[in-house]
Amino acid sequence: MATQNDIPNSTPEDLAKQVEIAEKHPDPPAMPSRLPDSLKTLEAKIDTSKITDEEVANVHRFQRACDYLAASLIFLSNGLYTGGDLEEKDIKTRLLGHWGTCPGLSIVYSHCNRIINKYDLNMLFVVGPGHGAPAILSALFLEDSLGPFYPRYQFTKEGLNNLINTFSLPGGFPSHVNAEVPGAIHEGGELGYALSVSYGAVLDRPDLIVTCVVGDGEAETGPTATSWHAHKFLDPAESGAVIPVLELNGYKISERTIYGCMDDSELLSLFSGFGYEVAIVNDTPDQNRVMAATMDWAVERIHDIQHRARVNREEIKPRWPMIILRTPKGKGCPKYLNGKFLEGTFRAHQVPLKLARTDTNQRNLLKDWLNSYNCQDFLDEHGLPTKGITEHLPPREKRMGQRHETYNSYLPLKVPDWKKYGVKKGETTSATSVVGQYLDELLVTNDSTLRIFSPDELESNKLDGALKHSYRTMQTDPELMAKRGRVTEVLSEHLCQGFMQGYTLTGRTAIFPSYEAFMTIVVSMLVQYSKFLKMGLETGWHGKFGSLNYVTSSTWARQEHNGFSHQSPRFITTMLSLKPGVSRVYFPPDANCFLATVARCMKSENTINLMVSSKNPQPAYLSVEEAEHHCKAGASVWKFASTDNGENPDVVIAGVGNEIMFEVVKAAEMLQNDIPELRVRVINVTDLMVLSSLHPHGMNPAEFDSLFTKDRHVHFNYHGYVMDLKALLFDRIQGTRVTMEGYREEGTTTTPFNMMMCNNTSRYHVARMALQHALHNPTVAVNCNMLCAKYAWKLEEIENYIMENKDDPPEIYAAPVFKNKTSTL
């Protein structure tokens, strides 16, 4: 136990010394904490005695070459610089890119190549600081991983010059890692997601290791903060492993990082508490020797943990290895510029010499910088790597830029027949409960290619049938450890999304169920993923992607008990804003349609699917066969609820959404009883995108007109925001003959039917709109005013009942009944 004597006291003299150091050093060490010195015993003990001088020289040579090319990508416009004066024309007119993180990335990449060779590893490289693309592209060129995908970047002088001259310019690679970069499974622009994506990638891939570099700026983000716990959902018996490397260079764009201001005791206690065994590699003259030994240690610790779980069948709570790598920000660039520190400060974050094209002094500094790498030691006269680099690269199929898992590993699911789970037409049941049983079989049938990730909401959304033959995956829970679970529940939507992305981008398929209102937490991650998906599909060399599958339940319509904060369909808006080619939005109206939709989504490729359904009991409007036909069409006339099967209607009422459609059907029932002379066509839209003229699922004009007529008024009762529906229908239907209601941002803690009333989506609102737009029918014209008044009074009566009884009238949820109806779809 630590004593008071173990805790250092900061005297005024100590503080003054720290200030003096800070003034003389570009990146002063962190001020000492008041933690016990004994915490430093938590640091892993690394043996460097087995690392040879040749190994150190090899990785250092690769780093120099990588840094030299990275700087060239940022600055040069006329190919590789091999000596002599630099002229203005040799410098790009626009200097773009980020140098600060590049040296750290080249260090880690070079050491990954070394351990791939030494241990015959299957390894991926995930880059959190994706703005370090110059280093990654340089490493990929040096290992000849660009040429196989891009002929213009072949392993030749011309290919290298093309890479340099076009970087971050039209026609070249962007300044951040993205789907166009071979080996990438992570969009590198927005920070925070690298670690969770890495852990998702190794699930169900027992022979895969991902080295994930997390920048110390990125480590400040919320998603990264929770991702440090991701290893706790990793079963070492069935999955691979991640080596997290915290690249601690001390600075963000313009100030110090939180982690850069933490001393060793603080870092060791923090990450040890997260469950890691931590090794710190400092910026010393012997850094490469220590880093080599540390990477060896990390791999051997991983293999030991996996052996104990797989061979010895031990149920263990492992401490996975983690590395903290300290490097000066922008290591290698000029130390000073205009009397201020450059190397080792935030000034080296992006382009250290911003005026290199027009300022002679800065151009000379750049020349000295490039010459400092002594490129003649590792590049030939054509700028290509010489002996000393090429022979130490991994075999081609093992190179991190050519791993098939990153671009050509999609494994289609085996999708069982959903019909055996279908419910009898007219039966009232929870659609999610039925689908939960189907998910169970899907997980059993695809026991290494399908997973569910949920923020502790599976049971709440009545999908717990998925757990019949599976378990949850938390390995630190003694009741769940080593159970080979397929369902990960962690109360972090960001972590669920990251897991799903990593799992999907390495060839598998995932499902993400959540409350409708809280799915918006991952909106930014979804948008970034959609960009990755779009660019990946446009490369021409990327294979198929598995689908991302979102299931939102506990919708606004039935979150009356939790209140306004739980009522939001905004995630739908985001889905509709994505590129039409990748986005799918489904509103299955009953259990059978939900089953058919899940089966369809499980077979889909290259898409992002959203399924919106209710967990509360609803009638099954359609038989199994009818549901199958309806879902294939995406929208259809519900003849059983329409007048004369929907022929020659006076008005069309359409529903989009589960609870919403119930109100449409009840409105049709009510109108049939109150004014049978009104000819109503009832339509359900289950695939929202069929309404769009721009979407691959969109109906052609003839199909649209046949369904919604050419001249009759159409009223939509819509689950989401009306503005979204208006955008879909903008060029489809004349504005004067369409009305629509949807969620109006009205809600509170109330009753389910009151939610419908306050958002104008109740059966009475639908019926009034139908009457008011069918006045060409003489009978309707005569009776419209009376019936509309009746429905208005009924709404007031129900509102009074709710306020008095704190519940909806019991008859509200009676299943609809239509007279003399035998027609089917």
Curated annotation (Swiss-Prot):
Q: What is the lineage of its organism?
A: Eukaryota, Fungi, Dikarya, Ascomycota, Taphrinomycotina
Species this protein is from: Schizosaccharomyces pombe (strain 972 / ATCC 24843) (Fission yeast)
Q: Does the keyword Lipid biosynthesis apply?
A: no
Q: Supply the enzyme class, top level.
A: lyase
Indicate yes or no for the key word Lyase.
yes
Q: Which keywords appear in this protein's UniProt record, sorted alphabetically?
A: Lyase, Thiamine pyrophosphate
What's the name of the protein? Probable phosphoketolase
Reading the lineage from the top rank, the first entry is: Eukaryota
Cofactor(s) recorded in Swiss-Prot or TrEMBL: thiamine diphosphate
Q: What is its EC number?
A: 4.1.2.-
Cellular component terms, GO, for this chain's entry? Answer: cytosol; nucleus
Task: Give me any GO biological process, just one.
Answer: carbohydrate metabolic process
The record's comment on protein family reads: Belongs to the XFP family.
Q: Return the InterPro entries for the record.
A: THDP-binding (IPR029061), Transketo_C/PFOR_II (IPR009014), Xul5P/Fru6P_PKetolase (IPR005593), Xul5P/Fru6P_PKetolase_C (IPR018969), Xul5P/Fru6P_PKetolase_CS (IPR019790), Xul5P/Fru6P_PKetolase_N (IPR018970), Xul5P/Fru6P_PKetolase_ThDP_BS (IPR019789)
PROSITE patterns registered for this protein in UniProt: PHOSPHOKETOLASE_1 (PS60002), PHOSPHOKETOLASE_2 (PS60003)
**Molecular function (Gene Ontology), one example:** aldehyde-lyase activity
